Design a protein with these regions (language model features):
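NTP/phosphate- and nucleic-acid-binding module
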Residues: 1-191
């Protein structure tokens, strides 16, 4: 179980690293009102701790803040103003598979109930986009930018063919390139 959780945390590291976020992790354990027996909770919490240790990053315990159906790892990022936002989460759920009667056959041929992993790498997409816009001050990384580059020929007559050739090369390289063909007309309008 911990290996699957560790894989989720590796994905968090890759995604948040690409986005340029520093993040912290917390292991949230069994709340007062919860479902399931002590042994299942202890096993699940142990798997989360093992996966967190495997990352080599610091993490904290967050006693009693797990979901009613299982423990979880919360990943928080700081925005440009220093506020913390909970974004990614990896949650273990051993209640729903049991309630739905889900089963699998293990290597020994025994019927077992799986543990469900709820994984949200970005968390709420809207929240993540807002944090990312604030974090980058609106200057998105090139690979994520909706406008990666623009070709603006100063004179359409004299530079138009060359500008189109450059645009095609950038397009072939996988960049989204806007071609602004009416630049001179816009300058005249402004004047």
């Amino acid at each position: 179980m911990w290996r699957e959780v560790a894989g989720c945390l590796e994905l968090v590291e890759r995604v948040y690293g690409k986005l340029g976020f520093e993040y912290s992790m917390r292991c949230s354990t069994r709340p007062e009102k919860s479902l399931g027996d002590d042994a299942a909770w202890e096993k699940a919490e142990g798997a989360l701790r093992e996966a967190l240790d495997e990352t080599g990053r610091p993490w904290e315990m967050n006693p009693g803040d797990g979901a009613f159906y299982g423990p979880k790892i919360d990943v928080t990022v700081r925005d440009a103003l220093g506020r913390e936002h909970q974004c990614a989460t990896v949650q273990l759920d051993f209640q729903l598979p049991s309630r739905f009667g889900l089963k699998y056959t293990d290597a020994e041929g025994e019927s077992r109930t799986p543990v469900l992993i709820h994984r949200a790498i970005l968390g709420s997409l809207e929240r993540m986009l807002a944090i990312l816009i604030e974090h980058t001050k609106g200057r998105w990384p090139l690979w994520l930018s909706p406008r990666q580059c623009a070709i603006v020929p100063i004179s359409g007559d004299a530079h138009g063919d060359y500008a189109h050739a450059v645009r095609n090369q950038l397009d072939d390289a996988g960049l989204w390139c806007e071609f602004v063909s009416r630049f001179c007309e816009k300058i005249y309008e402004i004047e």
